[in-house]
Amino acid sequence: MAIKLIVGLGNPGQEYMFTRHNAGFWFVHHLAQQFNIALAPDKKFHGVTGRGQIHGSDVRLLMPLTFMNKSGQSVVPMVKFYGIDNDELLIAHDELDIPAGSIKLKTDGGHGGHNGLRDITPHIGNDFHRLRVGIGHPGHKSKVSGHVLSKAAPDEQIAIDSALSAAFEALPLLLDGDIEKARSQINGFKLPE
């Protein structure tokens, strides 16, 4: 099935905008800019939403404004209201277990400790598509909170942006429902040396 809803997970507020935890927001924000999709607050879905054409496909965008650990309060109502099947849903989020500059497309699986996914999966299951944007791990779990809530170093940010660009290039495949080709293209991305 083709992707009909693209969600970017993050935390609302200017103080969080450029933190690693907002990598999902960066993805959706860039899509909205690139394809001239107006984003506006939507109280019904506790988020910022938009709808428009991306590579000829009608797509909805969502950035929850509920803070990361309450993402389900935004995503679940929108999925249910519009009758979005899980295989039509793509959730972009930061991923500690992948180095900055890497990006992976995954379907199914657990929440992997990600609080945004942890709040969504009990309500809709786990068989949706995830765009896992690598932000790297700080080395010890006691440093995770500070890591995700801080800005990436300039070289890391360049690497993350390059990985996001690789996902943008695979978007036509995702929107056409060719998930396996998209997965191969995205997961095969390597930073230039």
Swiss-Prot record:
Binding site for tRNA: 16, 67, 69, 115
Lineage: Bacteria, Pseudomonadati, Pseudomonadota, Gammaproteobacteria, Moraxellales
Assembly mode: Monomer.
Catalyzed reaction equations: an N-acyl-L-alpha-aminoacyl-tRNA + H2O = an N-acyl-L-amino acid + a tRNA + H(+)
Pfam families associated with the record: Pept_tRNA_hydro (PF01195)
Family membership noted in the UniProt record: Belongs to the PTH family.
Function, as annotated: Hydrolyzes ribosome-free peptidyl-tRNAs (with 1 or more amino acids incorporated), which drop off the ribosome during protein synthesis, or as a result of ribosome stalling.
Protein name: Peptidyl-tRNA hydrolase
Top-rank taxon, per record: Bacteria
Site (Discriminates between blocked and unblocked aminoacyl-tRNA): 11
Gene designation: pth
Cystine pairings recorded for this chain: none
Subcellular location: Cytoplasm
Keyword terms of this UniProt record: Cytoplasm, Hydrolase, RNA-binding, tRNA-binding
GO cellular component: cytoplasm
This protein's record includes keyword Transferase: no
Transmembrane segments: none
Any one GO MF annotation of this record: tRNA binding
NCBIfam families xref list: pth (TIGR00447)
Site description Stabilizes the basic form of H active site to accept a proton, residues in chain: 94
Organism: Psychrobacter arcticus (strain DSM 17307 / VKM B-2377 / 273-4)
